[in-house]
Amino acid sequence: MPLEEDVKQDVRKWSELYLEVPNKHLGGMPACPFAKKTWKDNKVLVGVKGKHKWYKTQLNLYLKNIDWNKHELLIFCDPYFNYGIEDLQNAIDEYNKEYNKKDVFFMGFHPDNPANEEEQEFLVTPNGDAPTVDSDVEYSMMLAQKFSLLQEASDTLHKSGYYKLWPRGYYQDVVVSRKKTYRRIFGGQHDG
């Protein structure tokens, strides 16, 4: 099987095993309550960087061509990564600086910085035990989605009490900082 297909299947399995299952640390709610439906409705586009291709050139091509009415999430994977965690974070920050005002939000995952039980147990052991994942593929991921859609979903989850079980520091780093950025760009007050 070609590497591109391996990566796409691995991303799908990651979502199924970690993001979509009822999570004991979150009162039975999945880590990402909207993931299962988004996949089911074919609203996820997984792109894989080609070998000997420039990262930003490839990602920019996906961003230029994505139809946000058809897809709600772009997961851009790089199985040829040769950059560190800080480099990926710098790229995420650059893309957010440029694209947040265009209603697109970026986040990422680097294989050298996986979620850990101490800080993000709910992302590591959704059912109490770490799922067994048979994969020899390593890749970085850059996720892009409509900022307004993400913030609307986050506000809905906040009102339901979903975030009460999140680790406080992780909640501040992810949810509160994102909401402050959204309110700064698009107006309104930070209320959560």
Where do the model's predicted regions map?
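Expand to "…catalyze enediolate/carbanion chemistry for C-C bond making/breaking, isomerization
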Residues: 1-192
